[in-house]
Each structure stands twice: as structure tokens, then as C-alpha cells.
């Protein structure tokens, strides 16, 4: 496998990959491919951290021959944290503090649980740190993301919007890529608006979704809001 920056020629393939990776995972169907489609023109999008993982097969033993199939993708976004001024000792006096997030991160279903997602993420985190990105927060499964250095965001005094500040939020994770970047601060995070584009523009999303092959939407155990 090789990891490289996404190119315009990859867009449709990557969106289809994202759709396959998230279909019926968190809800019947998915919207992550539309989020990605719209995010590329969002000022919060970070093109230098827009990576694809491309399949490679062995050629004559001296060089690899790329067959062109993309099996993984991850994108990053600028974000911010609203500072809780009474508890922030960094001299900020309230306001907001720059941070970053990432996602969707997608691995084709045929390649899941084989280590490719962690390999892609770790590569991207190294590049993010090289760019000076000091803090990441995101929503995800700590069972997976702990292997890339993430822990509960509450341990860094970062709270999730609309959730009680005195409770740990098991899906809200964070990591300081640059030690001390977030020292002596406390604040509340709300995901960037770009992640809600499908909810805010349902007709546009449905028109976009109609350009893909039809797939069955299923209500399954483990999805958000699932009830027996």
C-alpha cells in the first residue's frame, strides 16, 4: 500500500469508498460521502492532510505496480474550542482557541480489521504534527483510537457541546500532538458546521445520493438511536 495526497481525479472513487465504508454503520444509509464532497470547498478543509491509501501489488520484485484501487481515505479540518474563561489560565480571557479535527476516515469493507486504518491514521498524524497542528479532538470509538494516542477529551478539560461538563463522554476523544499546546485551559468543543451539511440541506443531499447506485437502508443494532 502507498499513502499519497488525494487528487481531483480521485474524488468520485473516494466518495464511493466513503459511502461503502459507512453505509448502515451509524444510521440507515449514510451521509459521510456528501460531507466529504462538500468539504473540499470549505475554508476549514486542509488539503495538505487529505490522504488516500492506494493498493499496490508486487511486480517483478524490484518495484511495485499500482493497480489504482483506493482502499482508504482520511481528511482533516480546522476547528476551534470555546474557552471557559473562569477556568482557563492561559491568559486567553475567554473567546475561542484554534484546534483541529479529522474525519471521515474510511477503509473499504474488504480491508477493514487488517490494520490499514491505523496505518493511514498514524501517517496522517505525523504529517499533522509536522504542520504545527497541536491539538485534535474527534468523535469515535476509544477501543480503536487509543492505539493512535487518543484518550477521553475530558482528561484534557475539553467538553462536548450539549453534554454535562461533569460527565465523561465515551465517544469524545482528544490528543495533544504538541505537548503543552493546550496546557492550563478548559473549553467546550462543537464540531465544525461543515459536518452537518446533509442535515441542513436535505434536498441537495438526496439529489447527490441519487447519483450513486441504489443500496438498501437498514436499521441495525449498534446504530445511533437503535431500539429493539
Task: Identify the role of each PLM range.
Residues 89-91:
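Glycine-biased, low-complexity coil/linker segments
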Residues 15-66, 73-75, 80:
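Active-site rim helix/loop that mediates acceptor-substrate recognition in acyltransferases
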Residues 130-133, 140-165:
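Conserved active-site alpha-helix within GNAT-family acetyltransferase domains
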Residues 102, 110-111, 115-123, 133:
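Conserved acetyl-CoA pyrophosphate-binding loop and the N-cap/start of the following alpha-helix
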Residues 2-14:
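A short beta-loop-alpha structural element at the N-terminal edge
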Residues 179-228:
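Acidic/histidine-enriched, glycine/proline-rich intrinsically disordered or flexible terminal extensions
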Residues 6, 105-107, 141:
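Hydrophobic adenine-recognition pocket in adenosine-nucleotide-binding enzymes
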Amino acid at each position: 500500500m502507498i499513502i499519497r495526497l488525494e487528487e481531483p481525479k480521485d474524488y468520485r472513487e473516494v466518495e464511493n469508498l466513503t459511502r461503502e465504508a459507512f453505509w448502515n454503520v451509524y444510521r440507515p444509509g449514510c451521509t459521510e460521502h456528501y460531507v466529504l464532497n462538500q468539504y473540499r470547498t470549505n475554508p476549514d478543509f486542509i488539503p495538505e492532510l487529505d490522504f488516500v491509501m492506494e493498493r499496490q501489488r508486487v511486480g517483478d520484485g524490484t518495484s511495485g505496480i499500482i493497480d489504482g484501487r483506493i482502499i482508504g481515505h482520511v481528511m482533516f479540518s480546522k476547528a476551534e474550542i470555546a474557552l471557559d474563561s473562569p477556568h482557563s489560565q492561559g491568559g486567553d480571557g475567554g473567546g475561542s482557541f484554534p484546534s483541529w479535527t479529522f474525519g471521515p476516515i474510511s477503509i473499504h469493507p474488504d480491508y477493514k480489521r487488517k490494520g490499514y486504518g491505523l496505518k493511514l491514521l498514524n501517517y496522517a498524524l505525523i504529517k499533522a504534527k509536522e504542520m504545527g497542528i497541536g491539538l485534535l479532538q474527534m468523535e469515535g470509538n476509544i477501543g480503536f483510537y487509543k492505539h493512535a494516542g487518543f484518550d477521553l477529551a475530558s482528561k484534557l478539560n475539553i467538553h462536548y457541546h450539549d453534554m454535562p461538563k461533569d460527565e465523561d463522554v465515551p465517544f469524545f476523544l482528544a490528543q495533544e500532538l504538541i505537548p503543552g499546546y493546550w496546557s492550563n485551559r478548559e473549553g467546550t468543543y462543537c464540531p465544525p458546521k461543515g459536518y452537518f451539511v446533509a442535515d441542513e440541506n436535505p434536498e441537495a443531499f438526496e439529489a447527490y445520493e441519487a447519483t450513486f447506485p441504489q443500496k438498501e437502508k437498514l436499521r441495525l443494532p449498534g446504530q445511533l438511536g437503535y431500539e429493539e
